[in-house]
């Protein structure tokens, strides 16, 4: 159960206002209102950049990627509430909101129905829903991505390119990794096209801890300064993680206590701790890390927070953004050391692995996901 519920609330008053408490958050008994304020404050303090600026001709626009999971929906809810508070106090807001949902070919949810509900509940913002195959249409340097699609006379449309690319991937981890990477690329392009200066990701502390270990395990640890920290990204946009100080179980408690129908907008297969697939063939690195941290946060939340706090201390080199970039994930690769042997690795998946990737501009992590056949067929 998210949070430690208090059986006898009269014996455990809220530590902040002395009203009857409803749960214990990190050893602190809190009432309903103080807990809601706790979540809001954790999020809003990360948005000092978007305070009301009376001298600005127009407010900056931010993009909120929606997955209809607990974190992204809660983030939109808190941002909408924060905007209303700004407007009631100053007559204007500090930022404009755009939201986008990327259709996942491996998920089947009623996205349009959920998006209509979100539009109705949080009106006044811009909303969009994009198919993932639009990444082949919108990415300006799409030739680099298209070169990773197996050559076939039938792969002429964006839909076909995506199908062939996904079908060419040899493991569940590879498919999950590439799909996530393509989603990020598409979200970034949509942000640029809609005039957004920043992307506000809904990653909780738990999610960022998961990402820290999974990206490292997949060979993309060098990208962590941009994947878990607030600030400029290699894409020319600012990345922000407003929920970075909130555990997923705290977001679940917030959702369950919300009085605005927040729960009806959330579509997650499992609200509690994730259970990994019983089949090792279908289990991904992301699944394992998600299962681990969602179970650890129940009794040892400080471990989860420490992982994120430590990863956030990582800094990219000053000239990192001028380095050559990976064709797939678009992350800067130090010294252009692409592929397995560029990083001095000695892992091989078969004969001629080094020559297969020798001329490919894909990083170590992406090299592990993209099969040999794909790269060798399109090698330069």
Swiss-Prot record:
Pfam families attached to this UniProt entry: CTU2 (PF10288)
An example Gene Ontology biological process: tRNA wobble uridine modification
Intrachain disulfide bonds: none
Keywords: Cytoplasm, tRNA processing
This protein's name: Cytoplasmic tRNA 2-thiolation protein 2
Domain of life of the source: Eukaryota
Pathway(s) this gene product operates in, as recorded in its UniProt entry: tRNA modification; 5-methoxycarbonylmethyl-2-thiouridine-tRNA biosynthesis
InterPro entries: CTU2, Rossmann-like_a/b/a_fold
The UniProt record lists the keyword Ribosomal protein: no
Family that this chain belongs to: Belongs to the CTU2/NCS2 family.
GO CC annotation terms, alphabetical: cytosol
GO molecular function: nucleotidyltransferase activity; sulfurtransferase activity; tRNA binding
Localization (cell): Cytoplasm
Signal peptide limits: none
Species per Swiss-Prot/TrEMBL record: Pyrenophora tritici-repentis (strain Pt-1C-BFP)
Purpose of the protein: Plays a central role in 2-thiolation of mcm(5)S(2)U at tRNA wobble positions of tRNA(Lys), tRNA(Glu) and tRNA(Gln). May act by forming a heterodimer with ncs6 that ligates sulfur from thiocarboxylated urm1 onto the uridine of tRNAs at wobble position. Prior mcm(5) tRNA modification by the elongator complex is required for 2-thiolation. May also be involved in protein urmylation.
């Amino acid at each position: 159960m998210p949070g430690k519920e208090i059986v006898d609330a009269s014996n455990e008053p809220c530590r902040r206002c002395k009203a009857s408490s409803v749960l214990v958050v990190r050893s602190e008994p809190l009432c309903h209102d103080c807990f809601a304020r706790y979540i809001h404050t954790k999020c809003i303090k990360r948005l000092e950049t978007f305070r009301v600026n009376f001298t600005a001709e127009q407010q900056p626009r931010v993009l909120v990627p929606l997955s209809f999971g607990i974190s992204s929906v809660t983030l939109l809810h808190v941002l909408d509430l924060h905007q209303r508070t700004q407007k009631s106090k100053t007559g204007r807001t500090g930022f404009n909101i755009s939201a986008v949902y990327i259709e996942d070919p491996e998920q089947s949810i009623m996205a349009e129905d959920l998006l209509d509900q979100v539009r109705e509940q949080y009106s006044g913002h811009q909303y969009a829903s994009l198919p993932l195959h639009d990444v082949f249409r919108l990415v300006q340097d799409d030739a680099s991505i298209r070169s990773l699609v197996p050559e076939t006379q039938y792969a002429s449309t964006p839909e076909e390119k995506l199908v062939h690319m996904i079908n060419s991937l040899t493991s569940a981890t590879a498919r999950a990794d590439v799909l996530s990477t393509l989603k990020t690329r598409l979200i970034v392009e949509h942000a640029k096209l809609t005039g957004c200066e920043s992307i506000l990701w809904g990653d909780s502390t738990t999610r960022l801890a998961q990402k820290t270990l999974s990206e490292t395990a997949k060979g993309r640890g060098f990208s962590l300064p941009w994947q878990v920290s607030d600030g400029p990204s290699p894409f020319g946009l600012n990345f922000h993680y407003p929920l970075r100080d909130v555990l997923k179980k705290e977001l679940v408690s917030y959702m369950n206590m919300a009085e605005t129908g927040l729960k009806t907008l959330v579509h997650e297969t499992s609200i509690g701790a994730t259970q990994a697939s019983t089949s090792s063939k279908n289990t991904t690195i992301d699944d394992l890390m998600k299962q681990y941290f969602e179970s650890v946060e129940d009794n040892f939340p400080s471990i989860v927070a420490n992982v994120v706090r430590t990863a956030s201390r990582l800094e990219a080199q000053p000239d990192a953004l001028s380095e050559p970039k990976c064709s797939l994930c678009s992350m800067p690769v130090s010294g252009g050391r692409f592929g397995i042997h560029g990083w001095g690795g000695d892992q091989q998946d078969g004969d001629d692995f080094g020559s297969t990737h020798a001329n490919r501009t894909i990083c170590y992590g992406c090299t592990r996901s993209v099969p040999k056949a794909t790269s060798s067929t399109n090698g330069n």
